[in-house]
């Protein structure tokens, strides 16, 4: 089903796109590139019917289809039920050791909207952004579809401080649910984790709101 999402509303922070452009230029040149994802259960692919239908794999597939001359490797470092506090502790082993060139970070429904988690999220973002490969980083804010809650207010401060692009489901998909144009059970069985249709929708916001 095609949904009429206002993708322009999904830009939580425009940020500097210089690194993203550099990765795309390298892809056009046919280089080998690592496309990586770090987050919680949604990134892991929870409730997608198979791993290839989670939002992260959809984004990876977009890179492959858009730049067929390049050699891409998919790195999914999502672990369900984890926050950015655990994310920063495992970032080196699970993500940075694999030398990513493009990274999506997704913890806005795992972290609470508190100063503590703003600090742990900032530590994670800084660790990834300043790592050896200097990857392009995209911050993704998922949302609870029953009440619109997430940690975007706190996480958004970090996006602005580091001038990083960030996209939001709170301002794209959630308003459509509230308005009744999308039935929540069409995209999520539990008001949080997307089903296959929901994962595809999240991936479309990731791509089109950047």
Can you name each region flagged by the protein language model?
Residues 31, 54-75, 80-82, 86-208:
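Alpha-helical cap/lid subdomain in secreted, periplasmic
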Residues 38-39, 140:
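Short hydrophobic segments within beta-strands
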Residues 41-44, 109-111:
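A short, flexible beta-alpha/helix-coil linker loop
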Residues 1-37, 43-50, 61-70, 194-209:
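N-terminal secretory targeting modules
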Residues 37-38, 106:
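Structural cue for short, hydrophobic secondary-structure segments
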């Amino acid at each position: 089903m095609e949904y009429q999402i206002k993708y322009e509303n999904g830009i939580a922070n425009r940020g500097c796109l210089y690194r993203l452009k550099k990765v795309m230029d390298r892809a056009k040149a046919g280089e080998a590139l690592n496309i990586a994802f770090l987050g919680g259960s949604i990134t892991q692919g929870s409730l997608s019917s198979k791993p290839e239908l989670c939002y992260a794999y959809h984004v990876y597939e977009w890179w492959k289809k858009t730049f067929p001359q390049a050699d891409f490797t998919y790195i999914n470092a999502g672990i369900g039920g984890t926050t950015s506090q655990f994310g920063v502790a495992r970032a080196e082993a699970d993500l940075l050791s694999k030398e990513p060139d493009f990274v999506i970070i997704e913890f806005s429904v795992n972290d609470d909207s508190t100063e503590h988690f703003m600090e742990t999220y900032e530590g994670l973002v800084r660790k990834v952004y300043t790592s050896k490969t200097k990857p392009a980083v995209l911050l993704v804010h998922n949302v609870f579809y029953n009440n619109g809650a997430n940690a975007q207010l706190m996480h958004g401060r970090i996006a602005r401080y580091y001038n990083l692009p960030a996209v939001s489901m709170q301002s794209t998909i959630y308003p459509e649910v509230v308005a009744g144009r999308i039935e929540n059970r069409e995209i999520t069985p539990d008001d949080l984790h997307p089903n296959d249709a929901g994962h595809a929708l999240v991936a479309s916001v990731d791509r089109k709101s950047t």
